[in-house]
């Protein structure tokens, strides 16, 4: 190569060479190829299934659904989580390789939904079992909301550092896999203490003189006024 061709090389190299860091390259590759593990237990999963069709086409985001947690880096929980399902959900999360992310989809997953008031077997929030990165409220959320949640997760991935995320999860998170059920007496049975409702005749027949003698001395002027 002659010396005359060097200026031409300098002009074309600025458009063909990209300078970046290994962290940015890793984040870019991860946010562009999320492989979700679909943990659907209720009607919210039907809304997510509509993303597979041609109308929304979630393949354009690089999503490839996986059936094995060892090949997934995103778990999407949709629907009610019961006490019996809690250990299996935690095990699936632990089998996923780092870095891994969680999207809680629907009111039943986030707070227990309508089953959280009277049900004895519903987990009141999946974040009591595994750490959640994006909360997606709704009953059920629309497919457009799911796309918005995925976009927010992609933005979060593009700004993070893998080492800092792993250390923060080890220090600040505490997972609970065992749920104990304590049977207590109900407060709405309709039976009450009879002593509080009905006083005995001995307490009702107390004269006024005896009553005032047991109390502190009060003048008649104070009683009248």
UniProtKB/Swiss-Prot annotation:
Q: Which UniProt keywords apply?
A: 4Fe-4S, Chloroplast, Iron, Iron-sulfur, Membrane, Metal-binding, NAD, NADP, Plastid, Plastoquinone, Quinone, Thylakoid, Translocase, Transport
> Which top EC class is named for this enzyme in its record?
translocase
PROSITE patterns named among the record's database cross-references = COMPLEX1_20K
Can you cite a GO biological process for this protein?
Answer: electron transport coupled proton transport
Cofactor(s), names only, from the UniProt record: [4Fe-4S] cluster
Q: Where are the annotated coiled coils located?
A: none
- Topology with regard to the membrane? Peripheral membrane protein
Q: Which InterPro entries match?
A: NADH_UbQ_OxRdtase-like_20kDa (IPR006137), NADH_UQ_OxRdtase_20Kd_su (IPR006138)
| Ranges that cross the membrane | none
Its chief place of residence is plastid
Q: Which Pfam families match?
A: Oxidored_q6
Q: Which reaction does it catalyse?
A: a plastoquinone + NADH + (n+1) H(+)(in) = a plastoquinol + NAD(+) + n H(+)(out); a plastoquinone + NADPH + (n+1) H(+)(in) = a plastoquinol + NADP(+) + n H(+)(out)
Molecular function terms from GO: 4 iron, 4 sulfur cluster binding; iron ion binding; NADH dehydrogenase (ubiquinone) activity; quinone binding
Role description:
NDH shuttles electrons from NAD(P)H:plastoquinone, via FMN and iron-sulfur (Fe-S) centers, to quinones in the photosynthetic chain and possibly in a chloroplast respiratory chain. The immediate electron acceptor for the enzyme in this species is believed to be plastoquinone. Couples the redox reaction to proton translocation, and thus conserves the redox energy in a proton gradient.
Subunit architecture: NDH is composed of at least 16 different subunits, 5 of which are encoded in the nucleus.
The protein's name is NAD(P)H-quinone oxidoreductase subunit K, chloroplastic
Q: Which gene encodes it?
A: ndhK
């Amino acid at each position: 190569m002659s010396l005359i061709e060097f200026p031409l090389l300098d002009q074309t190299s600025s458009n063909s060479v990209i300078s970046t860091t290994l962290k940015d390259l890793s984040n870019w590759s991860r946010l562009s190829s999320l492989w979700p593990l679909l943990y659907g237990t209720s009607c919210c999963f039907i809304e997510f299934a509509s993303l597979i069709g041609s109308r929304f086409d979630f393949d354009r985001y690089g999503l490839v659904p996986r059936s094995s947690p060892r090949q997934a880096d995103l778990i999407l929980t949709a629907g009610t989580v019961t006490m019996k399902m809690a250990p299996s959900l935690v095990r699936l999360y632990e089998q996923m390789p780092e870095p891994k992310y969680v999207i809680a989809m629907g009111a039943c997953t986030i707070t227990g939904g309508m089953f959280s008031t009277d049900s004895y077997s519903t987990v009141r929030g999946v974040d009591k079992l595994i750490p959640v990165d994006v909360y997606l409220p709704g009953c059920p959320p629309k497919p457009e909301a799911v796309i918005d949640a995925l976009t927010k997760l992609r933005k979060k991935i593009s700004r993070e550092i893998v080492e800092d995320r792993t250390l923060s999860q080890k220090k600040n998170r505490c997972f609970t896999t065992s749920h104990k059920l304590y049977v207590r007496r109900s407060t709405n049975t309709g039976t009450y203490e009879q002593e509080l409702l009905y006083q005995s005749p001995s307490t009702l027949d107390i004269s006024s003189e005896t009553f005032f003698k047991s109390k502190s001395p009060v003048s008649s002027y104070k009683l009248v006024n």
